[in-house]
A protein has these predicted regions:
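Short, flexible segments with low predicted structural confidence
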Residues: 3, 27-30, 66-67, 78
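Thiol/selenol-based redox catalytic cores and closely related redox-interacting motifs
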Residues: 44-136
Length: 136
């Protein structure tokens, strides 16, 4: 349950995906808590990446935004593996087996049958999601 900035109570179902030792994930979880928002945390390291969730993220956010090419996991890949990532299917296959390569956090904002996916810490967008629900 979240308290929106206009003082009304909102009840979005928030699932935050990431890894617990990631600084941006820690910051994001603290920010949600400061807003009075409970959320479910899905740990990539322990729980993996659900294929249906990954498909939704790719459809909404795009594989290019999800794939963290600046992170350590990407830089440690050999050049052949990096070069093989050229479309949604190849990127999704890599993200399924190496979830640390996904830009974090990924958040699903749900209200009824509506869902919105955001990638990375984006306070202005998050405030809109809290105020208006997924249909921002």
């Amino acid at each position: 349950m979240c308290l929106a900035h206009d003082g009304t109570m909102k009840h979005p179902d928030i699932t935050l995906y990431g890894i617990p030792n990631c600084d941006t994930v820690k910051k994001s979880r603290a920010w949600l808590s400061a807003q009075g928002c409970g959320h479910h945390f899905h740990d990539f390291k322990k729980q993996g990446v659900p294929a249906d969730a990954l498909a939704l993220w790719v459809a909404q956010a795009g594989w290019e935004k999800l794939l963290n090419r600046k992170g350590t996991t990407w830089r440690k890949l050999d050049l052949v593996t990096q070069a093989a990532v050229s479309d949604a299917a190849s990127a999704s296959a890599l993200m399924e087996v190496q979830p640390s390569i996904i830009k974090r956090p990924v958040i699903e904002w749900r209200s009824g049958s509506e869902v919105r996916v955001t990638v990375g810490f984006d306070e202005p967008t998050w405030l809109k999601c809290l105020k208006n629900g997924p249909s921002v």
